[in-house]
Amino acid sequence: MIKSTAEVRQAFLDFFATKQHQIVKSSSLVPGNDATLLFTNAGMVPFKDVFLGAETRSYTRATSAQRCVRAGGKHNDLENVGYTARHHTFFEMMGNFSFGDYFKNDAISYAWEFLTGELGLAKEKLLVTVYATDEEAFSYWRDEVGVPEDKIIRIGDKSANKKYESDNFWSMGDTGPCGPCSEIFYDHGEDIFGGPPGSPDEDGDRFIEIWNIVFMQFNRQSDGRMDPLPNPSIDTGMGLERISAIMQNVHSNYEIDIFQALIKDTAALLDCSDLEHKSLRVIGDHIRSCSFLIVDGVVPSNEGRGYVLRRIIRRAIRHGHKLEATGHFFHKLVASLIAQMGEAYPELAQQQAIIEKLLRIEEEQFGRTLDRGMILLEDILANLSGDIIKGDDVFKLYDTYGFPADLTADIARERNLKIDKDGFDVAMKQQRERAQQASQFGTDYNQQLKSDQNTAFKGYDNDSYSATVVELFNSQDQDPVSQLNSGEQGIVILDHTPFYAESGGQVGDSGLLHLDGGVFEVTDTIKLGNAFAHRGTAHTDVGLNRRVKAEINVERRAAIVKNHTATHLLHEALRKVLGEHVTQKGSLCDSDKLRFDFSHFEGVTAQELHDVEQMVNNEIRRNHAKQTESMYIEEAKAKGAMALFGEKYDDEVRVVTLGDFSIELCGGVHVNRTGDIGFLKIVSESGIAAGVRRIEAVTGTGALDFINQQTASLTTIAALVKSDVTNASSKVELLISRSKQLEKEIGQLKQELAAQAGSDLVNNTIEINGVKVLIADLGSVESKALRGMVDELKNKMQSGVIMLATANGPKVGLIAGVTKDLVGRVKAGDLVNMVAQQVGGKGGGRPDMAQAGGSQPENITSALESVSAWLTEKLA
């Protein structure tokens, strides 16, 4: 009998495979090429472009178990995770999809057959909902499937004046594909509170939605018109954790096998005997989302996806401390997760070391401030009037101790308190932006430039090719046109082309389209679905069905492909030198340089860069022949071919192999042999985000030019220091050492002169209420000499108050000194701050010694004149 979570997952995929569905592996939690989404949060996300008509697949039926995260933007379930039966940051969404193939009746039949046939659920335990006006779905459920009419609930719009705003009507955005949906609910029994969907008690836990079937049959226009789609599609989703709970005869998702194992392992690690403690649930959930996010290349940071990951990690750590965890514990749970999910997701075991390392680093960083932050929070709570923590206090906890606002909200919730979220947002406004992206597709998809054409790429073996113009667009309004007139900018789509369209980091080709009477100058080439769009300017009239000779800029292409092939070598060299955790995070290969972004959590040392560069150049000298072949993607991955971040691949892929050194999935254009690159020179290495490094490099003549520039600079430096090139570095080191020594000697002399000047100042003391007081403007004496001067003066005066000022350019330096017998009457910090405020600054320090700065030297005289009156009052 199907029971375990792993069995349910496999049974679902196997069932739909028998219904001619292609099993599609879960895509990354980081949506490829989709800036509108923070994370993959639904099973249909990888197929979004297919539903929109911007991408085609080799299949029209698909099924998947998609990893999802909901912990940011609109879908932020974080504060509820652990406290309810079904909220998670990470979950798996089972789905079956039809891209213009089967529709409503088959989708309903398949769902019912799987639930009642394969899983054996009792039919009387199930009820369904349909959109109020969807008679087709209602009739099929009743007449063909046999669901009693009283078990089919019609769900209408949420309000009369908001048509199609319903729990049973799904939209991709304000415009674009949409349609009614039908949901299947499971009745957990009368002993659990709650009513059926549509009833006043629908938010109870008795009736739980387990499957949603979306019928994409309309295209909503900007004026609200609903046009029927020519090829209606199906998008379904069933939460694996929810259906597993039913199969294991438990009510809460946290009671299923995967979570129980994680909870028990966490309890054992933390010596917690209460297996029902909600903090164990929180930690069990969070180790899943954190581990899978790191697998997909997300690293903790202070913005975007990395900040969401950091929030989840810190929430887990805080709940560990609630359970009196000692030491670092969270990273130790990765092994437990692998034991539960490693078979379905082998990438967990493959990246275990990097997951554990990143979690431990984050634990260490947060652990240093957690206890101090909790002390501050307890102090805030002790002085709280009312039940709302002020936004400024929430911000202070965030800014000083790294407490995300939702972590503070979590703690407040446990004590029946709330936070002033609006006040926190105001305080955050001038701070670093955090990614709070909406998870709906908020674009008008009907306005996106689209083409239904298919361009055959001939550029692997041809620099020029004869072709026919099959589509034209005007650049100004991006409308399809029948002709581009001479002088107009636009887009030309051909049936065949040698022009490479920008993809995988390789820029698009430029060149000319030759026509009778003139040319179309191509400045860039991009993809529009399966069409290659040649962007540029017409220098003659270009009409549909015209024949052209498409000719790329050969010299530019040659420079681009050198950088592209070198990028493959660089990627592999980095993995060999730094470790297998290195993955591509982005790249650019143009005619001038290559830029490669990769995952690595610390700076690359000079020696490591040297080793990488030397390894790449060794492979260039080995002059490997480029080999390309097409194969199924799973076969390619089995051979060790690397798939690149953010790229989408068809079932059949092109594999580029460079000797025994590099093998990658790649549709780009390359040199024939690695020796064609010439050599590679790394120009720079830097960090561009937390956990992401960037290397820029040049190849071929670009590398030669760079070396020549470096050599010329070195020759100039050698001449300046009167040395030859060979000994220039030693001579420069000697000069730097001598310069530092001279600076040190000059500093000592200045301090001695200042001390002497200070001794002379003793004669300028005055008395205020029987206390010796010295107030002086020292002109341009260096600020760092002031402290020693004050110590010397205090020793000579034995009892007294000192206030000194100095100015160097626009910078003001202030220092106040008070002998210990007088600090009960005058505080040096108060004195220096009073003066500093008058010269555009502020400062503070100990009661006996305090320093400050300022930016208004013109006010020094008047500020010092105010000291006597201030001291007269203090010393009264």
UniProtKB/Swiss-Prot annotation:
InterPro entries: aa-tRNA-synth_II/BPL/LPL, Ala-tRNA-lgiase_IIc, Ala-tRNA-ligase_IIc_anticod-bd, Ala-tRNA-synth_IIc_core, Ala-tRNA-synth_IIc_N, Ala-tRNA_ligase, Ala_tRNA_ligase_euk/bac, DHHA1_dom. It comes from Colwellia psychrerythraea (strain 34H / ATCC BAA-681) (Vibrio psychroerythus). CDD domains: AlaRS_core (cd00673). The keyword Disulfide bond does not apply. Belongs to the class-II aminoacyl-tRNA synthetase family. It is found in: Cytoplasm. Its cofactor is Zn(2+). Zn(2+) binds at residues 564, 568, 666, 670. It is an enzyme of class 6 (ligase). The keyword Nucleotide-binding applies. It comes from the Bacteria. Its main location: cytoplasm. One of its GO terms (cellular component) is cytosol. Catalyzes the attachment of alanine to tRNA(Ala) in a two-step reaction: alanine is first activated by ATP to form Ala-AMP and then transferred to the acceptor end of tRNA(Ala). Also edits incorrectly charged Ser-tRNA(Ala) and Gly-tRNA(Ala) via its editing domain. Disulfide bonds: none annotated. Its EC number is 6.1.1.7. Binds 1 zinc ion per subunit. Consists of three domains; the N-terminal catalytic domain, the editing domain and the C-terminal C-Ala domain. The editing domain removes incorrectly charged amino acids, while the C-Ala domain, along with tRNA(Ala), serves as a bridge to cooperatively bring together the editing and aminoacylation centers thus stimulating deacylation of misacylated tRNAs. Keywords: Aminoacyl-tRNA synthetase, ATP-binding, Cytoplasm, Ligase, Metal-binding, Nucleotide-binding, Protein biosynthesis, RNA-binding, tRNA-binding, Zinc. This is Alanine--tRNA ligase. GO terms for biological process: alanyl-tRNA aminoacylation; negative regulation of DNA-templated transcription.
